[in-house]
């Protein structure tokens, strides 16, 4: 048997391990062997039964009993299964005949009915189709690949089992009396079991070979000092004591030697890593991409290599830095983007600390101090507890710090590029590194701050936005950012006003807190220093100083103007914007500052000087700041009120665009004032200047005075109490004699109406307290009661005799533009969001609305359109005063169907008189809503004069020779139709019946006249006859009524 087994092994070695041929041969042997095995098993059973018969009677009695019990239980189980099967067949519509057909059929037998085969045959028989499918599946698995790689030890380990099986077979064959036939049968069975065991062993050996390949990949890096990992700085190292020596210079030689040795270790570790990766499929794929791939593919391959192990891929790092330094902008920007992703968002740089140079490692000095010798050279034992891993890590960290600095230098170059896109991308890269990592933050912050002075406003605004975003992410950097902006922009000579304006605009949006009063104090100091610098340079008042800074010789230095768009006027506007930004910053910083009152009082004089600048809007902001200081700190209160009182007469107030801001300032100042006489003087002057302003400002002032009456009820004395003269007594009159001497006569007890100058109102006083406004009356309110704007009249009458609480007026509702917009009937604009990019913007919109007396223009956009049905259906008492005319017009003739019919008929009857008819309708409605608009004593003579005026215009023009008398009559008689409208409203039914004939007559009259030449027009009489006027008027009125 050993020779046969060796022959089978030699035969199997030359064959595939588990292919289709082997499987077919295997299944064939199974088919041949199974019948012999069955006969053998049957013979054994017969011999066993014969031997059992020769034993004791007890043995012969028990076995039949157990067999009978087994047969009975098997029959009972079979009957139960047949009953269940019969129930299922009946449920499906069958009967007992169907049960007989399938009763003895095995569930695995597809050949039809018939008695079931023995159990051994049913379990081990294979269908031919299944064998074919199994052979194809085994061939697709590719197990034959592992035949050549099979380890011989596996067969050696399996040989004892085979020997055991063979010995057992020999023993059984020797004891068997069947001889050679049974021996051959057993040999065939052994061959089947051997083949089956070999297949199993080879499959197992293939799986065992796959697992060591994974472990082998980990074993490749056993020779490395530092394991490959993306976060190299998180590699576990033994902790070393850190110390700072008093004299680090004595260790310089040892540090230099250790650094050289560490660099050699890093090179060796990198070489080992590269050799371990040389034959990997990933490395081959990377090499293919680097040799034949596109630029983006190369950058991606380099990035992936660095991400696997930054410490062992310095060469890939250098390649990316080289690409970032190319002159090609596309390559450089793409490489810089990859580097920023690695260094900013990736794990290459530590998040919680900066990189240290090799000589700056604290643990290095601790190790050198613990060593016996002060000088270390290569070949000696490492000092202290230093290991090679420490040295490799420190050497790479030193190299990475230098490489990172080179990247920042490249970013600085691209931040100054000529192309705007390159500068914008480089700016974003700088922000990405500065936001995510603390390494080189001072240099990165300097680059970002310097872009506030970029020649393109878009880039400068972008830099300002990124700085604010940086402060939101890192609030602890406020002091650093403010100091850098001051040093690099505000105090740096040669910076333009536009750059300083952008810088101040960035600083005044810094989020302040009561927990950081030093930040607010620092900002206040910067703001006031800028105020003084602007005042000394004369930029605010001297236009000539805007041309440039003066040199020592006195000649102005030319400023660079890259865009060529900035002129002297533009620079002056920028200066005013700069002052406005400074005032905004002071307003926001004062509530959080802890500056002493003496320091603020020194700067108040600067603010008062700004109130007299050329821009009135800037003066308003300065007054707002002074008012805040005067209220909270009680500084220069009287001077503030004098300046505010004087600003009411400033002619620039009429054209200012900050009326709402100014009225709010007046309201807060008056409400916080404790002197009623001063408040009355302000009210008196406010009423006096209203005749110079537009209705919007007038309505705001009247509403402001009505609100002040709630705080100061004594203001009613200006309206209710008459003026009285303060006389010291009765005046004494003396007669003059003829000789010129005075004779004493009796005093006459007549009260004089003369008011002494000491008690009379004097509006020219600088101090409002001394103007004696409290002794006068508001006579200036009388013209406002009959103001041409209806809203002004309503507010004035309500102020004189309060009857109802009027809503807060919106200045934008009473402007001329808003009035004209009502005739356009356009859709309202979308509401603008109040929250912008700055977190400081919503303060005015949300928190400050409770103190605003007059709102902004936002509500004007939300007013409903006058040509909408919701406006037509309003009751007359619900309509605002300025909208009464529109409501009357659309209520009477604003229905769409009626207007269309009237226009069609008017076009048909009067031709081009459609536009004139519409104007007459509008004028009619206007006079209806306000009768006094036409004026008193309107008679026919005035109409005739108006007709003559129109006639003379036509005569001078000479181009309009078709001006028919009917059209002239319509224009001149439009006023008369208004007066007759009320009387004709009751007779509309009769007028409609007579309209067709009169219209025809009017049309015929117009057609008979035709076109008149200029000479014929001159010969026409000035006045027409009464009959002609009657016909024309009848035709006109009937046509309009239709």
UniProtKB/Swiss-Prot annotation:
GO terms for cellular component: nucleolus. Residues 118-128 have a biased composition (Polar residues). The keyword Coiled coil does not apply. Keywords: Nucleus, Ribosome biogenesis. Residues 9-18, 63-79, 195-207, 902-911 have a biased composition (Basic and acidic residues). Residues 153-164, 173-194, 937-957, 978-994 have a biased composition (Acidic residues). Its main location: nucleus. Residues 1-20, 28-79, 101-128, 148-214, 546-567, 897-1020 are annotated as: Disordered. It is found in: Nucleus, Nucleolus. GO terms for biological process: ribosome biogenesis. Transmembrane segments: none annotated. Residues 962-972 have a biased composition (Low complexity). SUPFAM superfamilies: ARM repeat (SSF48371). InterPro entries: ARM-like, ARM-type_fold, CCAAT-binding_factor, CEBPZ/Mak21-like. Gene3D superfamilies: Leucine-rich Repeat Variant. Interacts with NOC2. Forms a nucleolar complex with NOC2 that binds to 90S and 66S pre-ribosomes. Required for 60S ribosomal subunit synthesis. Belongs to the CBF/MAK21 family. This is Ribosome biogenesis protein NOC1. It comes from Chaetomium thermophilum (strain DSM 1495 / CBS 144.50 / IMI 039719).
């Amino acid at each position: 048997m050993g020779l046969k087994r060796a022959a089978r092994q030699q035969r199997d070695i030359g064959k595939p391990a588990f292919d289709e041929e082997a499987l077919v041969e295997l299944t064939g042997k199974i088919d041949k062997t199974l019948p012999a095995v069955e006969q053998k098993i049957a013979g054994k059973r017969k011999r066993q039964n014969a031997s059992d018969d020769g034993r004791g009677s007890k043995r012969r009695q028990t076995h039949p009993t157990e067999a009978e019990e087994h047969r009975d239980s098997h029959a009972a189980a079979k009957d139960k299964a047949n009953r269940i099967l019969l129930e299922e067949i009946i449920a499906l519509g069958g009967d007992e005949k169907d049960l007989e057909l399938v009763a003895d059929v095995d569930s695995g037998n597809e050949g039809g009915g018939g008695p079931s085969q023995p159990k051994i045959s049913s379990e081990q028989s294979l269908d031919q189709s299944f064998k074919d499918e199994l052979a194809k599946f085994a061939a697709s698995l590719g197990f034959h690949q592992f035949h050549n790689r099979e380890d011989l030890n596996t067969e050696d380990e399996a040989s004892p089992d085979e020997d055991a099986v063979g010995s057992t077979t020999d023993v059984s064959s020797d004891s068997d009396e069947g001889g050679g036939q049974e021996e051959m049968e057993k040999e065939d069975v052994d061959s089947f079991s051997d083949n089956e065991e070999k297949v199993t062993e080879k499959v197992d050996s293939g799986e065992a070979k796959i697992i060591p390949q994974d472990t082998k990949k980990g074993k490749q890096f056993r020779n490395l000092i530092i394991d490959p990992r993306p976060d190299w700085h998180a590699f576990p190292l033994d902790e070393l004591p850190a110390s700072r020596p008093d004299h680090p210079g004595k260790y310089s030689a040892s540090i230099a030697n250790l650094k050289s040795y560490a660099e050699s270790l890093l090179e060796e570790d990198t070489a080992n890593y590269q050799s371990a990766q040389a034959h990997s499929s990933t490395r081959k794929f990377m090499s293919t991409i680097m040799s034949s791939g596109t630029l983006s593919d190369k950058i991606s391959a380099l990035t992936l290599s660095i991400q696997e192990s930054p410490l062992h891929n310095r060469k890939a790092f250098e390649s990316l830095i080289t690409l970032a330094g190319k002159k090609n902008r596309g390559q450089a920007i793409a490489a810089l983007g990859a580097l920023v992703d690695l260094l900013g968002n990736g794990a290459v740089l530590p998040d919680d600390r900066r990189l240290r140079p090799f000589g700056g490692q604290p643990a290095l000095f601790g190790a050198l101090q613990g060593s016996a010798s002060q000088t270390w050279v290569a070949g000696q034992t490492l000092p202290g507890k230093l290991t090679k891993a420490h040295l490799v890590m420190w050497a790479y960290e030193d190299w990475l710090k230098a490489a990172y600095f080179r990247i920042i230098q490249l970013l600085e170059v691209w931040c100054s590029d000529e192309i705007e896109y390159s500068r914008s991308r480089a700016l974003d890269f700088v922000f990405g590194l500065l936001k995510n990592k603390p390494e080189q933050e001072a240099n990165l912050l300097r680059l970002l701050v310097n872009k506030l002075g970029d020649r393109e406003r878009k880039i400068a605004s972008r830099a300002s936005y990124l700085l604010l975003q940086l402060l939101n992410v890192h609030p602890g950097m406020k002091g650093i950012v403010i100091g850098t902006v001051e040093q690099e922009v505000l105090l740096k000579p040669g910076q333009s006003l536009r750059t300083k304006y952008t810088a101040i605009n960035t600083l005044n949006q810094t989020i302040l807190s009561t927990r950081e009063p030093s930040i607010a104090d620092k900002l206040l100091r910067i703001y006031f220093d800028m105020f003084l610098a602007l005042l000394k340079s004369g930029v605010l008042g001297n236009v000539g100083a805007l041309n440039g800074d003066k040199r020592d010789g006195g000649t102005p230095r030319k400023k660079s103007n890259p865009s060529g768009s900035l002129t002297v006027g533009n620079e002056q506007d920028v200066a005013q914007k700069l002052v406005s930004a400074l005032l905004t910053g002071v307003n926001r910083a004062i509530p959080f500052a802890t500056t002493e009152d003496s320091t603020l009082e020194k700067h108040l004089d600067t603010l008062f000087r700004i109130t007299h600048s050329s821009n009135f809007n800037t003066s308003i902001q300065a007054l707002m700041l002074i008012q805040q200081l005067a209220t909270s700190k009680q500084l220069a209160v009287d001077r503030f009120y004098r300046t505010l009182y004087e600003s009411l007469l400033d002619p620039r107030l009429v054209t200012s665009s900050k009326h709402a801001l100014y009225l709010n300032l007046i309201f807060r100042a008056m409400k916080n004032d404790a002197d009623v006489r001063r408040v009355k003087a302000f009210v008196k002057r406010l009423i006096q200047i209203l005749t110079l302003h537009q209705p919007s400002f007038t309505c705001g002032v009247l509403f402001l005075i009505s609100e002040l009456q709630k705080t100061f009820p004594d203001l009613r004395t200006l309206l209710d109490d008459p003026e009285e003269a303060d006389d010291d007594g009765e005046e004494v009159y003396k007669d003059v004699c003829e000789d010129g001497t005075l004779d004493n006569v009796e005093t006459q007890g007549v009260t004089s109406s003369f008011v002494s100058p000491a008690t009379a109102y004097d509006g020219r006083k600088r101090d409002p307290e001394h103007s004696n406004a409290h002794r006068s009356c508001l006579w200036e309110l009388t013209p406002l009661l009959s103001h041409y704007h209806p809203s002004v009249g309503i507010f004035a009458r309500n102020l004189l005799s309060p009857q109802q609480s009027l809503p807060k007026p919106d200045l934008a509702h009473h402007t001329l533009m808003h009035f004209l917009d009502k005739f356009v009937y356009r859709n309202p604009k979308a509401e603008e969001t109040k929250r912008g990019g700055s977190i400081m913007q919503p303060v005015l919109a949300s928190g400050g609305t409770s103190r605003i007396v007059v709102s902004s223009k936002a509500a004007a956009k939300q007013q409903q359109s006058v040509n909408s049905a919701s406006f037509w259906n309003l009751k007359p008492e619900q309509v605002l005063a300025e909208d009464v005319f529109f409501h009357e017009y659309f209520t009477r003739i604003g229905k769409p169907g009626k207007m269309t019919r009237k226009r069609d008929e008017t076009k048909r009857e009067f031709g081009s008189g459609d536009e004139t008819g519409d104007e007459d309708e509008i004028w009619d409605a206007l006079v209806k809503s306000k009768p006094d608009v036409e004026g008193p004593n309107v008679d026919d003579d005035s109409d005739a004069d108006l007709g003559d005026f129109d006639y003379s215009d036509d005569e001078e023009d000479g181009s309009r020779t078709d001006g028919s008398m009917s059209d002239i009559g319509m224009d001149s008689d439009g006023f008369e139709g208004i007066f007759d409208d009320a009387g004709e409203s009751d007779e509309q039914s009769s007028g409609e019946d007579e309209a067709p004939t009169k219209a025809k007559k009017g049309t015929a009259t117009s057609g008979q006249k035709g076109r008149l030449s200029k000479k014929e027009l001159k010969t026409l009489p000035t006045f027409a006859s009464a009959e002609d006027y009657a016909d024309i008027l009848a035709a006109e009125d009937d046509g309009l009524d239709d």
